[in-house]
Protein backbone atom coordinates (compact mmCIF):
# COMPACT_ATOMS: atom_id res chain seq x y z
CA UNK A 1 0.00 0.00 0.00
CA UNK A 2 2.72 2.28 0.77
CA UNK A 3 4.73 1.56 -2.31
CA UNK A 4 1.84 1.39 -4.69
CA UNK A 5 1.98 4.63 -6.64
CA UNK A 6 5.73 5.14 -6.24
CA UNK A 7 7.93 4.97 -9.30
CA UNK A 8 10.72 2.36 -9.49
CA UNK A 9 13.61 4.81 -9.70
CA UNK A 10 12.61 6.58 -6.46
CA UNK A 11 12.31 3.30 -4.57
CA UNK A 12 15.82 2.34 -5.57
CA UNK A 13 17.17 5.66 -4.27
CA UNK A 14 15.53 5.13 -0.90
CA UNK A 15 17.04 1.70 -0.54
CA UNK A 16 20.53 2.98 -1.26
CA UNK A 17 20.16 5.73 1.32
CA UNK A 18 19.04 3.27 3.98
CA UNK A 19 21.98 0.99 3.22
CA UNK A 20 24.41 3.89 3.51
CA UNK A 21 23.00 4.94 6.86
CA UNK A 22 23.21 1.42 8.22
CA UNK A 23 26.91 1.21 7.31
CA UNK A 24 27.68 4.52 9.03
CA UNK A 25 25.89 3.41 12.19
CA UNK A 26 27.80 0.13 12.34
CA UNK A 27 31.10 1.99 11.91
CA UNK A 28 30.22 4.36 14.78
CA UNK A 29 29.35 1.45 17.05
CA UNK A 30 32.75 -0.16 16.42
CA UNK A 31 34.50 3.12 17.26
CA UNK A 32 32.64 3.41 20.53
CA UNK A 33 33.50 -0.15 21.44
CA UNK A 34 37.21 0.43 20.75
CA UNK A 35 37.24 3.53 22.88
CA UNK A 36 35.64 1.57 25.67
CA UNK A 37 38.30 -1.11 25.50
CA UNK A 38 41.10 1.50 25.54
CA UNK A 39 39.79 3.26 28.65
CA UNK A 40 39.21 0.08 30.57
CA UNK A 41 42.62 -1.38 29.92
CA UNK A 42 44.35 0.08 33.12
CA UNK A 43 41.75 -1.55 35.34
CA UNK A 44 42.50 -4.99 33.97
CA UNK A 45 46.27 -4.48 33.68
CA UNK A 46 48.43 -6.91 35.68
CA UNK A 47 50.41 -4.03 37.53
CA UNK A 48 50.79 -4.23 41.39
CA UNK A 49 48.16 -2.11 43.22
CA UNK A 50 49.30 0.87 45.46
CA UNK A 51 49.49 0.37 49.23
CA UNK A 52 48.57 3.01 51.84
CA UNK A 53 51.55 4.19 53.93
CA UNK A 54 49.26 4.63 56.92
CA UNK A 55 47.30 1.41 57.22
CA UNK A 56 49.26 -0.74 54.76
CA UNK A 57 46.19 -1.89 52.82
CA UNK A 58 45.52 -1.52 49.09
CA UNK A 59 44.19 1.78 47.82
CA UNK A 60 41.03 1.09 45.83
CA UNK A 61 39.48 4.52 46.28
CA UNK A 62 39.02 6.84 43.35
CA UNK A 63 41.13 9.55 45.07
CA UNK A 64 44.17 9.23 47.29
CA UNK A 65 46.82 11.54 48.85
CA UNK A 66 50.51 11.75 47.97
CA UNK A 67 52.76 12.96 50.84
CA UNK A 68 56.48 12.35 51.50
CA UNK A 69 56.58 10.35 48.23
CA UNK A 70 54.01 7.89 49.61
CA UNK A 71 50.35 7.17 48.93
CA UNK A 72 47.79 7.58 51.68
CA UNK A 73 44.11 6.97 52.15
CA UNK A 74 42.24 10.20 52.84
CA UNK A 75 41.39 8.93 56.29
CA UNK A 76 44.92 7.70 57.09
CA UNK A 77 46.91 10.94 56.72
CA UNK A 78 46.71 12.46 60.19
CA UNK A 79 48.99 14.00 62.88
CA UNK A 80 50.62 11.40 65.09
CA UNK A 81 50.33 13.70 68.14
CA UNK A 82 46.86 15.23 68.10
CA UNK A 83 45.31 12.85 65.49
CA UNK A 84 44.17 15.82 63.41
CA UNK A 85 43.11 14.80 59.87
CA UNK A 86 45.36 16.53 57.36
CA UNK A 87 43.34 15.86 54.18
CA UNK A 88 42.10 19.48 54.13
CA UNK A 89 45.31 21.11 55.44
CA UNK A 90 47.65 22.93 53.11
CA UNK A 91 50.83 21.67 54.78
CA UNK A 92 52.04 18.77 56.85
CA UNK A 93 55.44 17.97 58.36
CA UNK A 94 57.39 14.72 58.56
CA UNK A 95 60.09 13.87 61.10
CA UNK A 96 61.70 10.44 61.49
CA UNK A 97 58.89 8.80 59.53
CA UNK A 98 56.09 10.42 61.56
CA UNK A 99 53.58 12.94 60.30
CA UNK A 100 52.87 16.11 62.32
CA UNK A 101 50.58 19.05 61.96
CA UNK A 102 52.06 22.54 61.91
CA UNK A 103 51.39 23.34 65.57
CA UNK A 104 52.81 20.11 66.95
CA UNK A 105 55.85 20.25 64.71
CA UNK A 106 56.82 23.76 65.84
CA UNK A 107 56.07 22.84 69.42
CA UNK A 108 58.44 19.88 69.37
CA UNK A 109 61.10 20.71 66.82
CA UNK A 110 61.15 24.51 66.48
CA UNK A 111 64.57 26.15 66.82
CA UNK A 112 63.28 29.13 68.83
CA UNK A 113 61.26 28.49 71.94
CA UNK A 114 59.42 30.89 74.20
CA UNK A 115 61.45 31.62 77.34
CA UNK A 116 58.26 31.64 79.45
CA UNK A 117 56.20 28.65 78.27
CA UNK A 118 59.07 26.81 76.51
CA UNK A 119 56.89 26.11 73.47
CA UNK A 120 57.95 26.55 69.87
CA UNK A 121 57.53 29.83 68.02
CA UNK A 122 56.48 29.74 64.40
CA UNK A 123 58.19 31.86 61.79
CA UNK A 124 55.06 33.91 61.10
CA UNK A 125 54.23 34.64 64.75
CA UNK A 126 54.80 38.04 66.39
CA UNK A 127 57.22 37.87 69.31
CA UNK A 128 58.73 40.08 72.02
CA UNK A 129 62.50 40.11 72.52
CA UNK A 130 64.32 40.93 75.75
CA UNK A 131 68.10 40.53 75.75
CA UNK A 132 68.72 37.07 74.25
CA UNK A 133 65.27 35.68 75.06
CA UNK A 134 62.20 35.46 72.83
CA UNK A 135 58.63 35.45 74.14
CA UNK A 136 55.15 34.99 72.79
CA UNK A 137 53.11 38.16 72.98
CA UNK A 138 50.82 36.54 75.53
CA UNK A 139 53.76 35.22 77.57
CA UNK A 140 55.59 38.55 77.93
CA UNK A 141 54.06 39.43 81.31
CA UNK A 142 55.27 40.46 84.77
CA UNK A 143 56.23 37.49 86.92
CA UNK A 144 54.67 39.07 90.03
CA UNK A 145 51.40 40.61 88.84
CA UNK A 146 50.98 38.98 85.37
CA UNK A 147 50.59 42.40 83.78
CA UNK A 148 50.96 42.20 80.01
CA UNK A 149 53.89 44.32 78.86
CA UNK A 150 53.62 46.02 75.50
CA UNK A 151 55.94 48.08 73.36
CA UNK A 152 57.13 51.17 75.24
CA UNK A 153 56.59 49.79 78.75
CA UNK A 154 59.51 49.81 81.20
CA UNK A 155 60.51 46.45 82.59
CA UNK A 156 63.41 44.74 84.33
CA UNK A 157 64.87 41.24 84.22
CA UNK A 158 66.29 39.15 87.03
CA UNK A 159 67.42 35.55 86.33
CA UNK A 160 65.57 35.57 82.97
CA UNK A 161 62.34 36.54 84.74
CA UNK A 162 60.49 39.62 83.55
CA UNK A 163 59.14 42.19 86.03
CA UNK A 164 57.21 45.39 85.51
CA UNK A 165 58.84 48.62 86.61
CA UNK A 166 57.11 48.83 89.99
CA UNK A 167 57.87 45.27 91.07
CA UNK A 168 61.43 45.41 89.74
CA UNK A 169 62.20 48.55 91.76
CA UNK A 170 60.70 47.01 94.88
CA UNK A 171 62.77 43.88 94.26
CA UNK A 172 65.99 45.89 93.97
CA UNK A 173 65.22 48.02 97.02
CA UNK A 174 64.48 44.93 99.07
CA UNK A 175 68.09 43.78 98.67
CA UNK A 176 69.36 46.74 100.68
CA UNK A 177 68.70 47.63 104.28
CA UNK A 178 65.91 50.09 104.71
CA UNK A 179 67.07 53.54 105.93
CA UNK A 180 66.73 54.22 109.63
CA UNK A 181 63.55 55.98 110.68
CA UNK A 182 65.04 58.60 112.99
CA UNK A 183 61.64 59.86 114.07
CA UNK A 184 60.67 56.38 115.23
CA UNK A 185 64.01 55.86 116.96
CA UNK A 186 63.67 59.20 118.69
CA UNK A 187 60.22 58.25 119.98
CA UNK A 188 61.56 54.98 121.35
CA UNK A 189 64.86 56.27 122.70
CA UNK A 190 63.70 59.54 124.17
CA UNK A 191 65.30 61.78 121.59
CA UNK A 192 67.93 61.17 118.95
CA UNK A 193 70.07 63.68 117.17
CA UNK A 194 71.93 63.04 113.95
CA UNK A 195 75.71 63.24 114.16
CA UNK A 196 77.58 65.75 112.11
CA UNK A 197 81.13 66.00 110.81
CA UNK A 198 83.62 68.77 110.20
CA UNK A 199 82.66 70.85 107.23
CA UNK A 200 79.85 68.51 106.22
CA UNK A 201 76.89 70.64 107.22
CA UNK A 202 75.66 73.68 105.37
CA UNK A 203 76.88 77.06 106.53
CA UNK A 204 74.29 78.97 108.49
CA UNK A 205 73.63 82.42 107.13
CA UNK A 206 73.31 85.39 109.43
CA UNK A 207 73.59 85.30 113.19
CA UNK A 208 72.67 81.98 114.79
CA UNK A 209 69.99 81.83 117.40
CA UNK A 210 71.04 82.06 120.99
CA UNK A 211 68.73 79.25 122.05
CA UNK A 212 68.95 75.89 120.36
CA UNK A 213 66.55 72.99 120.56
CA UNK A 214 67.60 70.19 122.91
CA UNK A 215 68.11 67.84 119.96
CA UNK A 216 70.70 70.16 118.44
CA UNK A 217 72.39 71.18 121.64
CA UNK A 218 75.94 69.98 122.30
CA UNK A 219 77.06 69.41 125.84
CA UNK A 220 80.62 70.24 126.77
CA UNK A 221 81.99 69.47 130.21
CA UNK A 222 85.63 70.25 129.62
CA UNK A 223 85.25 73.94 129.05
CA UNK A 224 86.89 76.15 131.68
CA UNK A 225 86.81 79.89 131.84
CA UNK A 226 90.55 80.02 132.40
CA UNK A 227 93.29 78.84 130.07
CA UNK A 228 96.20 76.68 131.17
CA UNK A 229 99.23 77.13 128.93
CA UNK A 230 100.46 73.57 129.63
CA UNK A 231 97.23 71.74 128.70
CA UNK A 232 95.35 71.39 125.42
CA UNK A 233 91.59 71.88 125.51
CA UNK A 234 89.33 69.19 124.01
CA UNK A 235 85.89 69.76 122.56
CA UNK A 236 83.57 66.80 123.01
CA UNK A 237 81.38 66.91 119.95
CA UNK A 238 78.89 64.32 121.05
CA UNK A 239 75.29 65.41 120.84
CA UNK A 240 72.47 64.20 123.03
CA UNK A 241 73.18 60.70 124.31
CA UNK A 242 72.01 57.87 122.11
CA UNK A 243 69.74 55.15 123.40
CA UNK A 244 71.51 52.47 125.43
CA UNK A 245 71.16 49.97 122.61
CA UNK A 246 73.28 52.12 120.28
CA UNK A 247 76.96 52.50 121.01
CA UNK A 248 78.65 55.34 119.19
CA UNK A 249 82.21 56.46 119.35
CA UNK A 250 82.72 59.96 120.72
CA UNK A 251 84.25 62.45 118.33
CA UNK A 252 86.59 64.90 119.99
CA UNK A 253 88.44 67.87 118.61
CA UNK A 254 91.68 69.01 120.20
CA UNK A 255 92.59 72.69 120.20
CA UNK A 256 96.06 74.11 120.26
CA UNK A 257 97.01 76.79 122.76
CA UNK A 258 96.90 79.71 120.35
CA UNK A 259 93.53 78.55 118.97
CA UNK A 260 92.03 78.33 122.44
CA UNK A 261 93.42 81.73 123.45
CA UNK A 262 91.99 83.34 120.32
CA UNK A 263 88.51 81.86 120.78
CA UNK A 264 88.27 82.65 124.51
CA UNK A 265 89.53 86.17 124.01
CA UNK A 266 87.00 86.89 121.32
CA UNK A 267 84.27 85.31 123.47
CA UNK A 268 85.06 87.89 126.13
CA UNK A 269 84.26 90.55 123.53
CA UNK A 270 81.43 88.96 121.54
CA UNK A 271 79.51 85.89 122.67
CA UNK A 272 77.68 85.34 119.39
CA UNK A 273 79.81 85.91 116.27
CA UNK A 274 78.09 86.06 112.93
CA UNK A 275 79.02 84.23 109.74
CA UNK A 276 81.54 86.85 108.69
CA UNK A 277 83.25 86.77 112.07
CA UNK A 278 83.34 82.97 112.02
CA UNK A 279 84.94 83.03 108.60
CA UNK A 280 87.71 85.37 109.77
CA UNK A 281 88.17 83.35 112.96
CA UNK A 282 88.49 80.21 110.83
CA UNK A 283 91.24 81.86 108.80
CA UNK A 284 92.98 82.99 111.96
CA UNK A 285 92.82 79.70 113.88
CA UNK A 286 92.80 77.19 111.03
CA UNK A 287 89.57 75.59 112.31
CA UNK A 288 86.37 75.05 110.40
CA UNK A 289 83.42 77.36 110.85
CA UNK A 290 81.36 74.46 112.17
CA UNK A 291 83.86 73.71 114.93
CA UNK A 292 83.99 77.37 115.89
CA UNK A 293 80.21 77.59 115.94
CA UNK A 294 79.98 74.56 118.24
CA UNK A 295 82.64 75.90 120.57
CA UNK A 296 80.91 79.29 120.93
CA UNK A 297 77.58 77.56 121.48
CA UNK A 298 78.99 75.51 124.34
CA UNK A 299 80.80 78.52 125.73
CA UNK A 300 77.54 80.48 125.87
CA UNK A 301 75.84 77.59 127.68
CA UNK A 302 78.68 77.43 130.21
CA UNK A 303 78.53 81.18 130.68
CA UNK A 304 74.77 81.15 131.32
CA UNK A 305 75.15 78.42 133.93
CA UNK A 306 77.79 80.45 135.75
CA UNK A 307 75.55 83.52 135.76
CA UNK A 308 72.58 81.52 137.08
CA UNK A 309 74.67 80.10 139.90
CA UNK A 310 75.75 83.56 140.95
CA UNK A 311 72.18 84.87 140.81
CA UNK A 312 70.98 81.96 142.99
CA UNK A 313 73.36 82.88 145.79
CA UNK A 314 76.26 80.67 144.81
CA UNK A 315 74.34 77.35 144.84
CA UNK A 316 74.92 75.09 141.89
CA UNK A 317 71.68 73.39 140.91
CA UNK A 318 73.47 70.51 139.28
CA UNK A 319 75.53 69.25 142.22
CA UNK A 320 74.28 71.40 145.12
CA UNK A 321 77.74 72.83 145.90
CA UNK A 322 78.09 76.35 147.20
CA UNK A 323 80.20 79.00 145.59
CA UNK A 324 81.99 81.69 147.54
CA UNK A 325 79.76 84.74 148.07
CA UNK A 326 80.43 87.78 145.97
CA UNK A 327 82.56 90.57 147.36
CA UNK A 328 80.74 92.98 149.68
CA UNK A 329 82.60 95.94 148.28
CA UNK A 330 80.51 96.03 145.12
CA UNK A 331 77.22 94.35 144.31
CA UNK A 332 77.98 94.04 140.62
CA UNK A 333 80.81 92.80 138.52
CA UNK A 334 83.00 95.45 137.01
CA UNK A 335 83.83 95.24 133.33
CA UNK A 336 87.46 95.28 132.29
CA UNK A 337 88.99 98.66 131.86
CA UNK A 338 90.43 98.03 128.43
CA UNK A 339 89.50 95.73 125.58
CA UNK A 340 92.02 93.21 124.40
CA UNK A 341 92.30 92.51 120.67
CA UNK A 342 93.08 89.19 119.03
CA UNK A 343 96.32 90.55 117.70
CA UNK A 344 97.48 91.27 121.22
CA UNK A 345 96.27 87.90 122.48
CA UNK A 346 98.50 85.99 120.13
CA UNK A 347 101.49 87.70 121.72
CA UNK A 348 102.72 85.57 124.67
CA UNK A 349 103.99 88.60 126.51
CA UNK A 350 100.50 90.00 127.06
CA UNK A 351 98.30 88.64 129.79
CA UNK A 352 95.38 86.55 128.56
CA UNK A 353 91.93 87.23 129.84
CA UNK A 354 91.12 84.25 132.07
CA UNK A 355 87.53 84.93 132.96
CA UNK A 356 84.61 85.38 130.62
CA UNK A 357 82.21 86.23 133.42
CA UNK A 358 83.81 89.56 134.25
CA UNK A 359 82.54 91.23 131.08
CA UNK A 360 78.87 90.96 131.96
CA UNK A 361 76.94 92.61 134.76
CA UNK A 362 75.09 89.98 136.76
CA UNK A 363 71.96 92.15 136.76
CA UNK A 364 72.15 93.15 133.08
CA UNK A 365 70.28 90.88 130.67
CA UNK A 366 71.75 92.45 127.53
CA UNK A 367 74.79 91.17 125.67
CA UNK A 368 78.11 93.07 125.72
CA UNK A 369 78.97 95.48 122.92
CA UNK A 370 79.56 93.78 119.58
CA UNK A 371 82.99 94.04 118.03
CA UNK A 372 83.65 92.79 114.52
CA UNK A 373 86.67 90.81 113.52
CA UNK A 374 87.52 93.38 110.91
CA UNK A 375 88.56 95.76 113.65
CA UNK A 376 90.30 93.07 115.67
CA UNK A 377 92.50 91.92 112.86
UniProtKB/Swiss-Prot annotation:
One of its GO terms (molecular function) is DNA-binding transcription factor activity, RNA polymerase II-specific. Residues 333-346 have a biased composition (Low complexity). The keyword Calcium does not apply. GO terms for biological process: dorsal spinal cord interneuron anterior axon guidance; negative regulation of DNA-templated transcription. SUPFAM superfamilies: Glucocorticoid receptor-like (DNA-binding domain), Homeodomain-like. Residues 50-111, 112-174 form the LIM zinc-binding domain. Keywords: DNA-binding, Homeobox, LIM domain, Metal-binding, Nucleus, Repeat, Zinc. Residues 365-377 have a biased composition (Polar residues). Residues 228-249, 309-346, 358-377 are annotated as: Disordered. Coiled coil: none annotated. Residues 248-307 bind DNA. One of its GO terms (cellular component) is nucleus. It is found in: Nucleus. May be involved in gonadal development. This is LIM/homeobox protein Lhx9. It comes from Psalidodon fasciatus. The lineage of its organism: Eukaryota, Metazoa, Chordata, Craniata, Vertebrata.
Amino acid sequence: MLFHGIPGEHIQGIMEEMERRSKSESRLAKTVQMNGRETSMPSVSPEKPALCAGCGSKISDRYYLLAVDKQWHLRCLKCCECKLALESELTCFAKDGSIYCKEDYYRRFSVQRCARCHLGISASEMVMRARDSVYHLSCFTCTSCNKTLTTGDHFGMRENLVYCRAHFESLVQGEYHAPLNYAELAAKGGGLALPYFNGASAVQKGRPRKRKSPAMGIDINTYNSGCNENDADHLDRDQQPYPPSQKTKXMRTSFKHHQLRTMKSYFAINHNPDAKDLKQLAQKTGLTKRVLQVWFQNARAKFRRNVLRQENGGVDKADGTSLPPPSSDSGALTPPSTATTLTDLTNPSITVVTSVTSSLDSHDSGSPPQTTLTNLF
